[in-house]
UniProtKB/Swiss-Prot annotation:
Organism of derivation: Staphylococcus saprophyticus subsp. saprophyticus (strain ATCC 15305 / DSM 20229 / NCIMB 8711 / NCTC 7292 / S-41)
Record-linked InterPro entries: Calcineurin-like_PHP_ApaH, DNA_Repair-Maintenance_Comp, Metallo-depent_PP-like, Mre11_N, SbcCD_nuclease, SbcD, SbcD_C
Gene coding for it: sbcD
Protein name as it appears in the record: Nuclease SbcCD subunit D
Lineage: Bacteria, Bacillati, Bacillota, Bacilli, Bacillales
Signal peptide: none
Subunit structure: Heterodimer of SbcC and SbcD.
Length: 376
């Protein structure tokens, strides 16, 4: 059996004011093309299909078009759960009717002990739920962490698990030690959200969503597929794609398949003038860029100038104040320096230049006014 594991599509995502829908449509086209070659027996989407509980109509239409092609045109069974970004109600609409075409949308906690069976494989689904929802479902106020909730869920599943089959757990959660990214919204506020990987030992395989790095943890049987695209500048070095899990002769193997996006995210560091003169190394001008530049304090609206050359510049950081670098302490007694010299040294440390005669005169005028005000 060939299983495709994907998650964290985040359709409708907006990054620093820029809609990524065009990029998402492009990567889903690539995903569909790949599925035509892969011919999988089932596709598992482990949550966060949308980026928000209230996706716009274009995001909804993109998901519907993708699902129609994969499920109705290509007749591939789909198993989907909601993530912490999704609305259960919106995602679950018509789910019972969709099962007739082997599209299983699992957002109801009541279905956690009702596996989706495909061949000799049982898929146990755990949709994302808050601690309060878990307390209500199990009628137990003692559940205060995701680990405690997962313990109850796994015991609930264990009541019906068939050890003669291959049992796969599908969830949207954080395993301890997993690599985090800036674009991942915390599962909960005020409680520990990570869980111990040893809890899953009753399963042959665990397919997860939420963490965007496809190699978030080192495990022989727990997999994160990662997101289809880079969704924050902390993900620029992360590969993006999907995973293939194959079950053959009672052996389970997996491999990661990268997908090439329309645009990548890049972080570019250097001096402002080098950026404007196109001397800094940029893979492609159309990529989404975050510039971290020095020596631009004297520039009026540097973002505007950068966008004239790099139209998809999404972020700009002034690195002049870099407190992480070591500070060079000159052997000077600051008490012996006059005010103008101190200010000139400070200005030079920031801009790499010294005060002009006109700037010095203005500062002298301000200092005189301050001294006169202080003596009153």
């Amino acid at each position: 059996m060939k299983i495709i594991h994907t998650a964290d599509w985040h359709l409708g995502r907006i990054l620093n004011g820029k809609s990524l829908l065009e990029d998402q449509a492009y990567i889903l086209d690539k995903f569909i093309e790949a599925m035509k070659l892969e011919q999988p027996d089932v596709i598992v989407i482990a949550g966060d299909l949308y980026d928000t509980s209230y996706p716009n109509k274009d995001a909804i239409q993109l998901l519907e078009q993708t699902i129609d092609i994969l499920n109705l045109e290509m007749s591939i069974p789909l198993i989907m759960i909601n993530g912490n970004h999704d609305s259960k109600e919106r995602l679950n609409y018509g789910s019972k009717w969709f099962e007739k075409s082997h599209m299983y949308i699992r957002t109801d906690l009541n279905d956690m002990n009702k596996p989706v069976t495909i061949g000799n494989v049982d898929f146990y689904t755990m949709p994302f739920a808050t601690i309060n929802e878990m307390q209500y479902f199990f009628d137990d106020k003692a559940i205060e962490t995701h680990q405690q909730a997962l313990n109850r869920v796994l015991a609930y599943m264990h009541e019906v698990i068939d050890e003669n089959k291959v049992n796969i757990f599908v969830g949207h959660l954080t395993v301890q030690g997993g690599i985090r990214s800036e674009s991942e919204r915390p599962l909960t506020i005020g409680t520990v959200e990570s869980v111990d990987e040893n809890l899953f030992n009753q399963f042959d395989r665990v397919m997860l969503g939420h963490l965007h790095h496809p190699f978030s943890i080192e495990s022989n049987f727990i997999n994160y597929s990662g997101s289809l695209l880079q969704y924050s500048f902390s993900e620029t070095k992360q590969p993006k794609g999907y995973k293939i899990v194959e079950i053959k002769n009672q052996k389970i193997t997996d491999k990661f398949i990268p997908l090439k996006p329309l645009r990548q995210l890049e972080v570019i560091e250097g001096n402002y003038e080098d950026a404007i003169q196109e001397k800094l190394e940029v893979k492609h001008k159309e990529n989404y860029l975050h510039f971290k530049l020095k020596h631009m304090s004297h520039v009026s609206d540097p973002m505007m100038h950068l966008k004239q050359i790099y139209p998809n510049t999404l972020a700009l950081t002034n690195q002049t104040f870099d407190f992480n670098t070591s500070i060079h302490h000159e052997n000077i007694e600051i008490q012996k320096l006059d005010d103008e010299t101190i200010i000139d040294n400070f200005y030079n440390s920031i801009t790499g230049e010294h005060l002009t005669t006109n700037q010095s005169k203005k500062i002298e005028k301000i200092m005189t006014a301050l001294l006169e005000e202080g003596s009153k």
